[in-house]
Regions:
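Structural register within alpha-helical repeat arrays
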Residues: 488, 521-522, 584-585
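Cysteine-dependent hydrolase recognition
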Residues: 50-58, 76-89, 94-515, 524, ...
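N-terminal low-complexity, Pro/Thr/Ser-rich intrinsically disordered segments
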Residues: 15-45, 116-120
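Short coil loop/turn residues that delineate tetratricopeptide repeat
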Residues: 513-515, 544-548
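Alpha-helical repeat scaffolds
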Residues: 500-508, 532-545, 564-576, 580-581, ...
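Terminal, low-structured helical/coil segments at or just beyond the last alpha-helical repeat
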Residues: 598-625
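Sec-dependent N-terminal signal peptides
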Residues: 3-12
Length: 625
């Protein structure tokens, strides 16, 4: 076993005899997860499924002898995961027809089967008892909620009971005190039903994963001020004391499954930091300290970008490829401040591969289901674990970055590491930081968990996606058309072969068959390869570019003075037009004069409100309007 975490425990935190029960429990839960993962090999394949029935069938094939990622065949999530995981085999499962059994029974069967249950048994407790094993936590979902796909995967992977409760709302709502009390009673009821001890940290149940839509905030009588974060309420007693750490997963079937699979199967060895705080007073403590020296000693990569808006924009040309991100900023739900400028969620980097994120910022997760917020945009980019606030938290509510890294290197799970322990800080009480994702996910030093990788095997119930790629490319060559090249490029993008996609794009150009479909399939690869000229050419013939495609245009091309100004002027993004116009206004002034800038501002003002409206009105005065 790697001794680095033990050394860090002794030197960076406190001696074992001084540890609080909560601190001991933090180490214990991380150690239990690590022990479990070392014992369960990963099969080096990804299986793509067309529907939930096929998904559940694949999860039921898992065992303690081998588990593998199962993803819905939906982009951009599937290709994003594959680019990071780099499987030896990518398989497409044959469709399994939907079962007539209640979905609760189907989910429980899949979980129990992954632990050796026979003849359709549904009790994970009985199966675990036969193995003399205690669960690592409990997973709670709703039978009608699409995020049940994550619940099944996490329950099956770790051997956790899966429990079902009713609906409790979603989005930007706030549970009132009466509703919060009722939710506490319901959660406690299902925890009691498991038959495992859960009343205090360090007993049998120390983690709860809520896989369902919930309001991000609630009013709790045990809090010193309301509202508080929903995930910092669940797992506490009425007096506010914590008995479990909670993670929260929500979203579509595809997105929820993606979040679970990222947590379970991806390595996290590359870290990315963006520090926008001044090096003074309390802000300094929330800077990066000695992180740049600490992480390489743990065998981890460390990238620190300039905290200016320009620095962020330059780092994002072609997208960001990393595993764990930490960014600090001031701001609100719809903007964030860099060192020198204020910007909108539109400037949040595009992620080429999945990432976990700690965002030290106020309000970012106020309404995480709304894409055009800071938190919602990060999640739409492919963040699968997220530490952030859902209300004004105060800076000290966050664990400082250097302390966060020490905890992670010492074996704390990612979401657990973000919580203050009782007695350390007044914000250890129920407060406003939400923790999205799997609460058991680790971010340890390199080689701390060496999971065995098993060779995959192809069988008649699967199709090899590489065979599909070969056939599609051959068809495009023999019968060149916009449709056929687009089909081939969709597959090469899925398997993470951007250079091959670019080659197909070039071949389609040579054969004079490029059309809107081919262009649309080319854009993501051209973006990641930073082929700006080709990207612009393709973008011009895409019909009705979607939000992500517009973001790629701006993130790749807006800083380049050779980019034709007309394409940027025609693609100013709402509802944050002020930031786009501010970026290109100097170029418009040179080519179209002040009237060109004012026309763009006047058009944007028709739909503007809030900060966007105020900034546009200020700019209008600046340019003589």
């Amino acid at each position: 076993m790697n001794l680095l975490p033990i050394i860090l425990i002794l030197t960076c935190l406190q001696s074992p005899e001084q540890m609080s029960e909560e601190l001991k429990a933090s180490f214990l839960i991380g150690a239990r997860v690590a022990s479990h993962q070392r014992a369960v090999p990963i099969v080096n394949q990804v299986v793509l499924v067309p529907n939930e029935a096929t998904y559940l069938n694949e999860i039921s094939k898992w065992s303690t002898e081998g588990q593998y990622p199962v993803l819905f065949d939906s982009d951009p999530r599937a290709s994003q995961f594959i680019r990071k995981f780099k499987p030896k085999l990518i398989l497409r499962a044959n469709t399994v027809e939907s079962s007539k059994e209640p979905i609760i029974v189907q989910c429980r069967k899949a979980v129990a089967s992954a632990w050796g249950a026979l003849n359709g048994e549904t009790s994970i407790r009985e199966v675990l008892a036969q193995r003399n094993k205690k669960p690592l936590g409990v997973v709670i979902t709703n039978e009608q909620d699409p995020a049940r796909t994550a619940a099944v995967a996490l329950a099956a992977a770790y051997g956790q009971p899966i429990k079902f409760i009713g609906k409790w709302g979603s989005g930007n709502n706030i549970l009132n005190a009466e509703e919060t009390s009722a939710l506490m009673k319901r959660v406690n009821s299902v925890l009691t039903e498991t038959g495992y001890a859960y009343g205090q940290l360090g007993d049998e149940i120390d983690s709860i994963t809520m896989c369902m839509s919930l309001p991000s905030r609630c009013e709790f009588t045990g809090a010193r001020e309301n509202p508080i974060a929903i995930s910092d309420f669940i797992g506490r007693h009425q007096n506010g004391s914590r008995f479990a750490w909670t993670g929260w997963i929500f979203g579509s079937k595809s997105d929820a499954a993606y979040m679970a699979m990222c947590s379970l199967f991806l390595d996290r060895s590359a870290y990315w930091f963006c520090n926008t705080y001044q090096d003074s007073e309390n802000w300094k403590m929330y800077g990066l300290g000695n992180i740049e020296n600490m992480l390489p000693k743990a065998g981890l990569q460390c990238e620190i970008i300039d905290g200016t808006l320009r620095g962020l924009q330059e780092a994002d040309i072609g997208g960001i490829t990393t595993d764990v991100m930490l960014m600090n900023s001031k701001g609100n739900v719809d903007f964030f401040d860099m060192k020198n400028n204020r910007s909108s969620p539109a400037s949040i980097p595009i992620l080429n591969t999945p990432s976990a994120l700690m965002m030290i910022h106020s309000w970012s997760l106020k309404n995480p289901t709304e894409r055009l917020t800071v938190g919602g945009m990060w999640l739409s980019r492919g963040v699968y674990a997220y530490i952030g606030s859902s209300h004004e938290p105060m800076l000290n509510a966050f664990v400082p970055p250097t302390e966060m890294m020490r905890r992670l290197m010492s074996g704390f799970p990612f979401l657990v590491a973000a919580r203050w322990h009782d007695g350390q800080n007044i914000f250890a009480k129920p407060w406003r930081v939400n923790t999205i994702g799997d609460p058991l996910m680790l971010c340890p030093p390199k080689n701390f968990i060496l999971r065995q990788k098993l060779e995959p095997a192809l069988s008649e119930v699967y199709t090899d996606v590489m065979l599909e790629v070969k056939q599609a490319m051959e068809r495009a060559n023999k019968e060149p058309s916009d449709v056929h090249f687009a089909q081939a490029m969709q597959l090469t993008t899925l398997i993470g072969a951007d250079e091959i996609t670019y080659g197909l794009w070039s071949a389609a150009l040579e054969r004079n068959v490029v059309g809107a479909q081919t262009a649309k399939r080319a854009l993501p690869s051209l973006f990641r390869l930073e082929h700006a000229d080709a990207f612009i050419w393709a973008y011009r013939i895409v019909l009705n570019p979607n939000r992500l495609e517009r973001d790629m245009l701006w993130h790749l091309c807006s800083l380049k003075t050779v980019t034709p100004i007309d394409i940027l002027m025609k693609n100013v993004r709402t509802p944050f037009a002020c930031d786009d116009i501010a970026l290109i206004a100097p170029r418009i002034l040179k080519t179209h004069g002040s009237q060109g800038v004012l026309q763009l501002i006047t058009k944007a003002l028709k739909k503007a409100n809030g900060r966007n409206k105020r900034e546009l009105e200020r700019m209008r005065k600046t340019y003589g309007g």
